[in-house]
Amino acid sequence: MARKTPIERYRNIGISAHIDAGKTTTTERILFYTGVNHKIGEVHDGAATMDWMEQEQERGITITSAATTCFWKGMELAFPEHRINIIDTPGHVDFTIEVERSMRVLDGACMVYCAVGGVQPQSETVWRQANKYKVPRLAFVNKMDRTGANFYKVYDQMKVRLKANPVPIVLPIGAEENFTGVIDLIKMKAIIWDEASQGMKFNYEDIPADLQAESQKWRENMVEAAAEASEELMNKYLESGELTEAEIKFGIRTRTIAAEIQPMFCGTAFKNKGVQRMLDGVIDFMPSPIDIPPVPGHDDDDKEVVRRAADDEKFAALAFKLMTDPYVGQLTFVRVYSGVLKSGDSVFNPIRGKKERIGRILQMHANQREEIKEILAGDIAACVGLKEVTTGETLCDPDAIITLEKMIFPEPVISQAVEPKTKADQEKMGIALGRLAQEDPSFRVRTDEESGQTIISGMGELHLEIIVDRMKREFGVEANVGKPQVAYRETIRKPVSDIEGKFVRQSGGKGQYGHVVLKIEPQEPGKGFEFVDAIKGGVVPREFIPAVKKGVEDSLPNGVLAGFPVVDVKVTLTFGSYHEVDSNENAFKMAASLGFKDGCRKASPVILEPMMAVEVETPEDYAGNVMGDLSSRRGMVQGMDDMPGGGKAIKAEVPLSEMFGYSTTLRSMSQGRATYTMEFKHYSEAPKNVADAIITSRAK
């Protein structure tokens, strides 16, 4: 099958933003203008096409990134047809993992900001993730029709808060209820949309007289930014003071793809203005799969190899999301980096060393789907029939093995016990939790050995709430949940050496004998566990050393203070002894475990608690109370900024254990006018009185 759209006309973009910036509405409008949706879905009615899980429609927030495909020929139908694959990403901080996953497979991102709220805390998180994967991006300032809308304030905030380099390509005409359209700085014309056609039709008009000087100033700013793309353009600009339309587009595109600048657009998605011009910007300035460097990976021998984005290259793709569909079972969303994949093909998963067959391939449009025979380089689609693959794993041609860089997922910070309401729910709950954990790598399930309870862990209260909700809706499992528990950790503060661990049972017959001497040291935070074998002269035979390591590893999940997992320790095996007959692996495992526990007791063990970065946005009248309350929760207030629409943004670091039920307190303290976001920052040592209370409550 020949390609319908050449690869240079593909755009894989994500749309990401803060919770209420109007991201889903913006995506809806894109689908409407590109002719996919005939009736615009409104989030206000809970009918948006992209938000297709029931909870999303009820809560009006986007949780899973739906992937959808649409086609665009430009506002004036002047472009050849381009194919845009859009990934709608969630804006809630508990779902940061979803954003991270989609950033990984995108070629560009459209950042939506609210013209009133400006650059909010979540916007900073998303920006950091986009920096991490060097994603080219453009900005769309939405909600220009709202009271307090200010395009230029958002421009300033992007520079200050995000250290971004925004370059406006359009300017707003008016603001709030007087917002009527935009000035296109490339064409130097005003664009006025026709309201009756829901913005499908528009007119070019002359720039209003009172905006002439301002437009000229911002046009020069834009042309200058374009000229910096190359020496050639710079020389031309310095000589003639002007560049052609094609040169401006080339310059802005080059620098956007290099992530040096971010073109800026504005409008109001809800009132059908400005999204169309931003879509043209996606085509003009966002990269196609061949504009970005070929994707690197490693082959069987761990040598670096690259795959070009071309159909004649060997097949390589990344599975970036799993979803369970009620009709077809498990869907695996893949981004094809190179080659072609046909339904019925076999693919190899190098991480699991397994070969699997692709059943059907579906092109997704939010919650509708179309079956296709093949997907080509640069495409995003969903495959049916893959059993073993999980998020972040590579799929490749069995004859040309490549492992693409794996995604790294954060450790959960909050846990809850769940138990099924009836015996009949027991088995269903196991299946449901297994499926959900497969879909979402930041969600974990385990069984507590002592109590036999099922423990679920995730990135925040809302995260776990939605998991329990999905169990009920999608799998029909009724469950009771316990109180949220904080995921504490233990570590040590001082190094100890010459710690002996001995396990000896010799009472006639075959005995047990294992003896080790360990040195235990603290590691810097986040370094994890490290084991070093420093045995000289075979005092512990080679074959028993893995058993020593295993003995220590088996002791890590249960620390000596309160049974929490031990982190950031380095254990060195320095000496030991063995018995010709009685030594075996089990004896050395036991000896290492005993030695490690004894060593930890002597190495000043401490309890670590998760600290959260909390940002509260509040009207000024309540700022004092909010700060006082955060301090009473052992919070460290780190600063207070003014917000563009008035009010204060207070940043603080607060232990997670003190934040349960905070939303209720904040609501009553501010009469429902303050909002907050919270994300995990790092672990830090719990003060002695807190640690003592934790240890006492665990001992009960």
From Swiss-Prot:
The gene is fusA. It comes from the Bacteria. Residues 8-290 form the tr-type G domain. This is Elongation factor G. Belongs to the TRAFAC class translation factor GTPase superfamily. Classic translation factor GTPase family. EF-G/EF-2 subfamily. Keywords: Cytoplasm, Elongation factor, GTP-binding, Nucleotide-binding, Protein biosynthesis. It is found in: Cytoplasm. PANTHER family: RIBOSOME-RELEASING FACTOR 2, MITOCHONDRIAL (PTHR43261:SF1), TRANSLATION ELONGATION FACTOR G-RELATED (PTHR43261). It comes from Methylibium petroleiphilum (strain ATCC BAA-1232 / LMG 22953 / PM1).
